[in-house]
Amino acid sequence: RMRRTLAMVEAFRADDGETPLILMGYYNPIFSYGVGAFVADARAAGVDGLIVVDLPPEEDEELRPVAREAGLDFVRMATPTTDDKRIARVLDGASGFIYYVSITGITGTRSAAIAAVTEAVERLRRHTDLPIAVGFGIKTPEQAAAVVSAADAVVVGSALVQKIFDGLDDSGAARAGLVEAVLGFAGSLAEGVHGARRDARAP
């Protein structure tokens, strides 16, 4: 599956060399692939950075230095339970941006509390100049717009996956209009973000 993922990156890069691509997943597939081989192949395919969700700072020494030496950003994650002492450890060695997990629990199952997210982002900004992206629990253009008023970026994953799932028939094949539905939803999220930024710049 990792090779298929990297092949998808290569195919994307054939048409788009500008959009940043961050791979997000778990460490075991990287370990099984071989850290050095994975980093080299990911970089060659056109990957820009990594988010390894189950690899805390204390356990990333096999991967992070190799990734950074190859020019891949190593994005770290902060959560609502990350206190000021822990933040320092999370930020040490992080690059690219910080991914703030807006809710605890499993992604896609709850809605982010915008006020709490704003407070958390402000706290993170006191510790780092890295951009801050917020994800987990963001499902609508309105939520995305509200979050980006405080953060630098919004990450939407589960809502897009659900949109794809809703467009499959009982055999798992895509129904007519699935691609258009997914693109339309992604466009509405983007417009929510862009609209919020336009409003913020307005006099």
Label the predicted regions:
Residues 42-48, 66-75, 92-99, 150-154:
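Glycine-enriched alpha-helix->loop->beta-strand junction motifs that scaffold or abut catalytic
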Residues 1-12, 30-36, 52-69, 83-89, ...:
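Active-site-adjacent beta->alpha loops and helix N-cap segments on the catalytic face
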Residues 21-25, 50-52, 74-78, 98-100, ...:
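Hydrophobic faces of well-ordered beta-strands that scaffold small-molecule active sites
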Residues 45-51, 56, 100-108, 137, ...:
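Glycine-rich phosphate-binding active-site loops on the catalytic face of alpha/beta enzymes
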Residues 82-92, 127, 134, 138-154:
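Catalytic cores of alpha/beta
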Residues 1-22, 65-79, 115-132, 180-200:
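Alpha-helix-loop-beta-strand connector modules within alpha/beta enzyme cores
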Residues 72-110:
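Histidine/lysine/aspartate-rich catalytic loop segments that bind and position anionic ligands
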Residues 16-51:
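Hydrophobic alpha-helical segments and helix pairs
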